[in-house]
């Protein structure tokens, strides 16, 4: 029966008006003819031909889900959570305790009186914090190419070398390189994979996982000030750096647990590379392949998403004054209240409240759908700015405790919800690039904040103006970020209005067998 049909088809003359010849033409040929007639609506025909509806969760433009990948939501993921907790805690515990290191560095240079010493010493900690974020776009490329495990292990080892060599430095110039550059860059390569790897093991409970990681790391922010003030400081600055380097050596070992579940070679969609760009044919020239590889690792596709651009700009604006209290707090307390011997308690308070905030807001973030999570960051940044302005108004030490408890809660909310928002805006396949570019945009303002505050202190003789001005950027950034969910909602409404109104009619015709001549109703449906 098939051979007869084939013979008739082969013997038929194109353009023949013999009805018997028309009946003997194969269904495939008639379908191809019909498809050519419907060329302007080619994508719709392909949808009907597959006979199935797309039931994948909606993703932002340019974001691809990765062939229905479902994270395990636990299991070995909790080991990864522990390793990520140590990573976040050791890095940001050291950074948040830099106020004590700052005082030790200033004391080390007291024999060389310099009116701008606060400005120069502040650059040591600011460089380290800035490099963590400045290197993030490069870290994204390394993470995509080499994976989370190799990137994090190498980064932690570089940070270990930076802290160890800092113990032998004797000048600010050397500390700029060993602590600011080496430790900062190594921390960046160790830190960012710890954010990305959580998305490989959690999705529904990603906010909780981030909350556990960041809350556990707050224990370091609480314990390290006590360790530095009561135990390490009497040993001197060199021993301090040597002891801190042990934390990063342990991190290099724990990072071996960062086993990715989304391999770099997996393509999320047919014909697409991992980053969402078009795949390069085998016959392409060497130049084209080179350009394709460059486009992959310097992928700026995330910036085509308007909501991501607004969010990234708002966060980068807000962090200009974010790190100022951590660096200059202890010197401010010493000038405002004298030698109270209790100033280190403020770092413990901000670490403890930040841990509570990360657990609390991590769970709350899982309950808030979609991009509306950004409203949590909006509130935290605005309150953070107001609290920064309140610091000079505190006439008693207990007032500072209240202010820094609230600032810790805001810090916990901002840190915990950052990765889930990135996943919501760009999807899991581009989350690494999105986080990397965001942290890179944060680098310059976060680095510039503490030295500017030190310069204002040297000019005015106190920290009042510095803390007042440090509160302005978080408020402005929060206002900018407020519009992200509104823009997202407007874009969704516009996409619904521009949907093809004839789709329902075409599906109805298809169900009657009209769309595919030569096929039965059941065959058309299949």
Curated annotation (Swiss-Prot):
GO terms under cellular component: apical plasma membrane; plasma membrane
Keyword annotations from UniProtKB, A to Z: Cell membrane, Membrane, Transmembrane, Transmembrane helix, Transport
Subunit structure, as described in the record: Monomer. Homodimer. Homooligomer.
Residue segments, region Disordered: 1-44
Record topological domains on the Cytoplasmic side: 1-73, 143-156, 200-207, 264-309, 365-377, 420-434, 488-526
GO BP, sorted A to Z: brain development; central nervous system development; chordate embryonic development; locomotion; neuron differentiation; oligodendrocyte differentiation; optomotor response; regulation of thyroid hormone generation
The protein's name in its UniProt record: Monocarboxylate transporter 8
């Amino acid at each position: 029966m098939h051979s007869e049909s084939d013979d008739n088809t082969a013997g038929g003359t194109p353009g023949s008006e013999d009805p018997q010849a028309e009946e003997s033409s194969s269904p495939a040929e008639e379908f191809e003819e019909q498809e050519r007639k419907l060329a302007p609506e080619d994508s719709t025909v392909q949808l009907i031909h597959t006979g199935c509806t797309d039931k994948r969760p909606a993703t932002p433009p340019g974001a691809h889900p990765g062939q229905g990948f479902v994270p395990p939501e636990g299991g070995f993921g909790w080991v990864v959570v522990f390793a990520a907790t140590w990573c976040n805690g050791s890095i940001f515990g050291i950074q948040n305790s830099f106020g004590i290191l700052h005082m030790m560095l200033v004391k080390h240079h007291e024999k060389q009186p310099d009116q701008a010493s606060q400005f120069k010493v502040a650059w040591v900690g600011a460089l380290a914090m800035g490099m963590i974020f400045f290197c993030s776009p490069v870290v994204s490329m390394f993470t995509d190419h080499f994976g989370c495990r190799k990137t994090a292990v190498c980064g932690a080892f570089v940070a270990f070398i930076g802290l160890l060599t800092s113990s032998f430095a004797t000048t600010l110039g050397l500390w700029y390189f060993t602590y600011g550059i080496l430790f900062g860059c190594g921390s960046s390569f160790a830190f960012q994979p710890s954010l990305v790897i959580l998305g490989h093991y959690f999705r529904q409970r990603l906010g909780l996982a981030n909350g556990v990681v960041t809350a556990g790391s707050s224990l370091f922010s609480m314990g390290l000030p006590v360790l530095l003030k009561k135990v390490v400081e009497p040993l001197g600055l060199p021993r301090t750096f040597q002891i801190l380097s042990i934390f990063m050596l342990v991190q290099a070992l724990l990072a071996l647990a960062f086993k990715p579940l989304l391999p770099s070679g997996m393509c999320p969609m047919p014909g697409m590379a991992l980053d969402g760009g078009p795949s390069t044919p085998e016959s392409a020239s060497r130049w084209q392949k080179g350009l394709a590889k460059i486009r992959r690792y310097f992928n700026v596709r995330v910036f085509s998403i308007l909501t991501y651009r607004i969010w990234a700009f708002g966060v980068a604006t807000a962090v200009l004054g974010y790190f100022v209290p951590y660096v200059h707090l202890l010197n401010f307390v010493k000038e405002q209240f004298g030698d109270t011997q209790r100033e280190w308690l403020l770092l413990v308070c901000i670490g403890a409240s930040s841990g509570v905030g990360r657990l609390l807001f991590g769970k709350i973030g899982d309950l808030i759908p979609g991009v509306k999570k950004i409203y949590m960051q909006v509130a935290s940044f605005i309150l953070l700015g107001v609290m920064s302005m309140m610091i000079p108004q505190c006439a008693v030490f207990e007032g500072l405790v209240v202010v820094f408890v609230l600032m810790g809660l805001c810090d916990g909310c901002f840190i915990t919800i950052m990765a889930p928002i990135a996943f919501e805006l760009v999807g899991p396949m581009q989350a690494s690039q999105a986080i990397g570019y965001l942290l890179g945009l944060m680098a310059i303002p976060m680095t510039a904040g503490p030295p500017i505050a030190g310069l204002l202190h040297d000019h005015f003789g106190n920290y009042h103006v510095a803390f007042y001005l440090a509160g302005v950027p978080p408020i402005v950034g929060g206002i900018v970020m407020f519009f992200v969910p509104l823009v997202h909602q407007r874009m969704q409404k516009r996409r619904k209005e521009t949907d093809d109104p004839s789709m329902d009619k075409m599906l109805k015709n298809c169900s009657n067998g009209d769309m595919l001549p030569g096929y039965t109703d059941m065959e058309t449906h299949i």
